[in-house]
Amino acid sequence: MLVAGVVIETMPGRAPAVARRVSQMKGLTLFGSDGDHQVVAVSRLRGGAKLEGLLEALGALDEAILRVEPTTVSEEDD
C-alpha cells in the first residue's frame, strides 16, 4: 500500500469547500485546513494505484484547486 501526504492549495477562501469534497473521497483521510487556501490529507492507495493518478484526480476535483503537492510518500504492508 502506498501512503502519501498531500497539501492542496486552493483559491483564497475556498479551502473549506474543497476540504468537504476531499473528505468524501474513498481512500483519503482529511487532516485539516487552514480555513482559507490550504487543505492537508493522507491517501492510502491499494492494488497498484499510482500517486500520479491521485494527484490528477484531486486536481480535477474542483476548479478552485490550484495545486496538489505530495509531502511524504511511503510504502506499507497491506
Where are these regions (language model features)?
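Long, contiguous binding/interaction regions
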Residues: 1-78
